[in-house]
């Protein structure tokens, strides 16, 4: 029996509020993270991802208090990211109730951090987040580059090669966000999603650009992702999680109803 594909709502949290932007900019308010997380838990989300989108840029730590409140209300796996830079940061988040942590910029600056974190806490706890942007011109071999600091700083690192390296360093999962797609509602970048899914032996979560339920299906079928992440379509009630799961199941995709 195939493993069920997961649907993961993402809470981008800025100063204690859930927000949503377009291509990492133009932020609009979506509500209180604890209330939103509770709703998704009740609606049947498979997991929830909480990303403190200001943490790395402003050099402050993720709001432990909010994580504790969400963890006390939510009974599905919770991944927390944003400003995770040390083994102590990871321990703090796991103690606050997170099941996994997402490491982004810190992995780029110090890949051995991922290895140390995986050795200490287990690969199942460690998600490496990749913000990728297409840098090849039309007609060229497709190539995607890693950006850090909330998508503000280019690194020159090839996204597919980086994903393979991170899997080798002990990441348990890759959270792949297409910066070209983020918030645009035009669908995932299926090219980079498929390239990374095919290249690594660990699950890949597709993120960035969902505008309708067919995009979730495409992420799994065409992008070959193991899980699909979305934000605004759920936050602003364009669709509900049960609708998303029924739609995917109707297309022959195994999901937990």
Swiss-Prot record:
Pfam families: His_biosynth. Its EC number is 4.3.2.10. It catalyses: 5-[(5-phospho-1-deoxy-D-ribulos-1-ylimino)methylamino]-1-(5-phospho-beta-D-ribosyl)imidazole-4-carboxamide + L-glutamine = D-erythro-1-(imidazol-4-yl)glycerol 3-phosphate + 5-amino-1-(5-phospho-beta-D-ribosyl)imidazole-4-carboxamide + L-glutamate + H(+). GO terms for biological process: L-histidine biosynthetic process. The active site is at 12, 131. Keywords: Amino-acid biosynthesis, Cytoplasm, Histidine biosynthesis, Lyase. One of its GO terms (molecular function) is lyase activity. It is an enzyme of class 4 (lyase). One of its GO terms (cellular component) is cytoplasm. It is found in: Cytoplasm. It comes from the Bacteria. Pathway: Amino-acid biosynthesis; L-histidine biosynthesis; L-histidine from 5-phospho-alpha-D-ribose 1-diphosphate: step 5/9. IGPS catalyzes the conversion of PRFAR and glutamine to IGP, AICAR and glutamate. The HisF subunit catalyzes the cyclization activity that produces IGP and AICAR from PRFAR using the ammonia provided by the HisH subunit. Belongs to the HisA/HisF family. Heterodimer of HisH and HisF. This is Imidazole glycerol phosphate synthase subunit HisF. It comes from Cellvibrio japonicus (strain Ueda107). The lineage of its organism: Bacteria, Pseudomonadati, Pseudomonadota, Gammaproteobacteria, Cellvibrionales. The gene is hisF.
